[in-house]
């Protein structure tokens, strides 16, 4: 029986290994992590991450050929294939701080693999890593190998949170990069045979190591670039009276462009886009390509501009002050169908409003009060480091309360900000909400989820990103 071990029980490792276990009943899969609470959650009915369909997959396999354990060394020692799915956060200090990936966790995982291994192994990069990481890992493994042979593969994930299980069941492609040697080709084939049990062969792509590593960074950069492109257009649409939804629909009808990732919003979030682009920028700078680095930096700059623009619009619309005004924030996760708040635009929007002394009442169906308070007291890149390294404010943010439903959050509010496109926000009784709000009542739709015309009929003043402005908003121009 082939034994697989995955180091890291997070958003990538957990779902990926669960699906491999489901699709390959003859393979034994162990997911290991040093976090006891996280492994306990994976072994309970309350999984540590929310992902549609994940519960069912885990329940079908757990205890049969899928195991979650804190005994990292035992499972690594026994495995034929070791996936490494640990965090590669942005460095917070030292060389490359604020841009370069921090490979501390990767290096310690590699040293541990070399230390405990008693048989040859295939080591698979699953985390997003800078180009040439495999080379560094290879050196660590080789210099500590005690005669054991390791083959390094790059197998980046292309999951989208919220549709991860669907993406794993029917991937656009599976990418496997390896060394162009006899041993390298054999290692690629071994991993390919696992995926081939449910993925059509034409969707399994094989490349050299460096192409696979760079492909992941490039894919995320291209996706983020599309979002920043349409968000840049949304600012122009507001200035000219065009409608960004109509513009993006027309543009997306061009078969060379396509309709995906053309929805304007308050900005992109999630654990990957900003981190990977900053990493790409750093790699370009290190390779003497400042013009290329500058090009990719603009994607982040537009994203930051969009969030700033949104906050400025809120403040200017509400008589240029939100001091001591209650603002309801609907949605805190970076997108719907996930509880993930990493790099969510909601953090910067909320901090911007708090900086203007607003009182916030936040509701998100999947994000806990503890998580919201932690996010709002954290420094820029600390979110991706272990909890014990994250600075905690001695007190919670006083001007922030967390509500259990949208109606409580919006009661007596002066304005509503919609920051996540949860389906339930489309079905709210806005007449009831309007009656319980201060007047004039504002809705700032950061995801273009509500029917602005219907809300205006009720009596709301509505701002939708990239849409023609209400007369009220035209009379109160926002600073860009």
Swiss-Prot record:
Positions with a binding annotation for NAD(+): 8-13, 33, 38, 86-90, 127-128, 161, 272-275, 342
Membrane-spanning residues: none
GO-annotated cellular components: plant-type cell wall
SUPFAM superfamilies attached to this UniProt entry: 6-phosphogluconate dehydrogenase C-terminal domain-like (SSF48179), NAD(P)-binding Rossmann-fold domains (SSF51735), UDP-glucose/GDP-mannose dehydrogenase C-terminal domain (SSF52413)
Regulation: Inhibited by UDP-xylose.
InterPro entries listed in its UniProt record: 6-PGluconate_DH-like_C_sf (IPR008927), NAD(P)-bd_dom_sf (IPR036291), UDP-Glc/GDP-Man (IPR017476), UDP-Glc/GDP-Man_DH_C (IPR014027), UDP-Glc/GDP-Man_DH_C_sf (IPR036220), UDP-Glc/GDP-Man_DH_dimer (IPR014026), UDP-Glc/GDP-Man_DH_N (IPR001732), UDPglc_DH_euk (IPR028356)
GO molecular function, one term: UDP-glucose 6-dehydrogenase activity
Keyword Ribonucleoprotein applies: no
EC identifiers of the protein: 1.1.1.22
Active site: 272
Disruption phenotype: No visible phenotype. Displays smaller nematode-induced syncytia. Ugd2 and ugd3 double mutant displays a strong dwarf phenotype and often develops seedlings with severe root defects; cell walls have an altered sugar composition. Ugd2 and ugd3 double mutant displays abnormal nematode-induced syncytia.
Annotated metabolic or biological route of this protein: Nucleotide-sugar biosynthesis; UDP-alpha-D-glucuronate biosynthesis; UDP-alpha-D-glucuronate from UDP-alpha-D-glucose: step 1/1
Annotated family: Belongs to the UDP-glucose/GDP-mannose dehydrogenase family.
Function: Involved in the biosynthesis of UDP-glucuronic acid (UDP-GlcA), providing nucleotide sugars for cell-wall polymers. Required for the formation of cell wall ingrowths on the outer cell walls of nematode-induced syncytia.
Name this polypeptide is given: UDP-glucose 6-dehydrogenase 3
